[in-house]
Amino acid sequence: MKSLDKKDEGKKGEDGEAGNANTGFFTPNNKIDFSNVKIEPLFEETVDFETFSKSDFRAVKVKDCVPVPKSKKLLQFTLDDGSGSDRTILSGIHAYYEPEELIGKTLIAITNLPPRAMMGVESCGMLLSAINQKKDSDEEELHLLMVDNHIPAGAKLY
């Protein structure tokens, strides 16, 4: 997985153009090739607005991220959700990210899900990510939803 550090800004990417290489954010200089991406079909079942609006989507800042002992998949996130108390969320994304590359990032979480114990640790929410499969391959890609670091911890998404 490529680093998302600020130090990569201004470097020339594989296409030879300067831009915010490896930041995960679109800039006019970034050329993205989606020709080898297979997207799952949209759900046909609809969710009424009242049900959807019960989900509390918040910007969260990654204070710490470590692998969960005895798990190959889980990462344990310590997050600032703007409440003044740390929030712990576990996510099965270790195959796609190394913990240290996520510290300091701003992510999106659903914060009002009931707590769930995994590997002896209580997870209090869910981090949002996008997942797709490469065309003509069984290889799956996962991209954690990262947003602008100027968004404060606890900001509500509408």
Predicted feature residues:
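Phosphate-backbone binding interfaces of nucleic-acid-interacting proteins
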Residues: M1-Y158
